[in-house]
């Protein structure tokens, strides 16, 4: 969540989506692996080597060739899905806070349509810092809304910022919205 303070009564934060280095690396590996398994399967069926490495034409089509073909199909299906998410930049968006109109706009790119949430300042109970360490650490800022059990996350999924930066952004947002800050221990 990049805080771009445009003026004293407005805050706009840009949220990154699925266009991350890790998704490009995993997508590339899935592409190469999926095509490789499919070519190995086709090589075992036709008896011709379609891969420059190894000798897949000597593999028996049943069961090795069929299994490699299934792995190739599964890898390519996952591959197309991941590249589609990267193409649409799934999860990207913005948070817009306007003090003069006392409104909050949260926009995110969804899988098939965009999600847009509009709130008034009086619907916000507090700003919550959701911090958990361990194997799968999480450091995110969320809005606790009146009449809703689950907080509304503001930070992007998979963002792991330094703890001090998350605390400062949460405190700045709570002060801007004139609400309490939860989650500090």
Swiss-Prot record:
It comes from the Bacteria. It is found in: Cellular thylakoid membrane. GO terms for biological process: photosynthesis. It is a multi-pass membrane protein. Seems to be required for the assembly of the photosystem I complex. Belongs to the Ycf4 family. This is Photosystem I assembly protein Ycf4. The gene is ycf4.
């Amino acid at each position: 969540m990049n805080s771009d303070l445009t003026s004293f009564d407005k805050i706009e934060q840009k949220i990154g989506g699925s266009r991350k280095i890790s998704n490009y690396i995993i997508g590339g590996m899935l592409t190469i692996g999926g095509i490789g398994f499919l070519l190995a399967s086709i090589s075992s069926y036709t008896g011709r080597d379609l891969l420059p490495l190894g000798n897949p034409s000597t593999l028996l089509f049943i069961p090795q060739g069929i299994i490699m073909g299934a792995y190739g199909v599964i890898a390519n299906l996952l591959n197309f899905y991941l590249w589609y998410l990267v193409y649409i930049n799934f999860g990207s968006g913005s948070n817009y806070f306007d003090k003069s109109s006392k409104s909050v706009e949260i926009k995110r790119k969804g899988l098939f349509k965009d999600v847009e949430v509009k709130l008034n300042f009086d619907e916000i109970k507090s700003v919550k810092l959701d911090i958990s360490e361990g194997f799968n650490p999480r450091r995110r800022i969320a809005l606790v809304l009146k009449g809703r059990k689950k907080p509304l996350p503001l930070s992007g999924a998979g963002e792991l910022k330094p703890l001090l930066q998350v605390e400062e952004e949460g405190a700045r947002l709570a002060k801007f919205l004139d609400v309490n800050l939860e989650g500090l221990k």
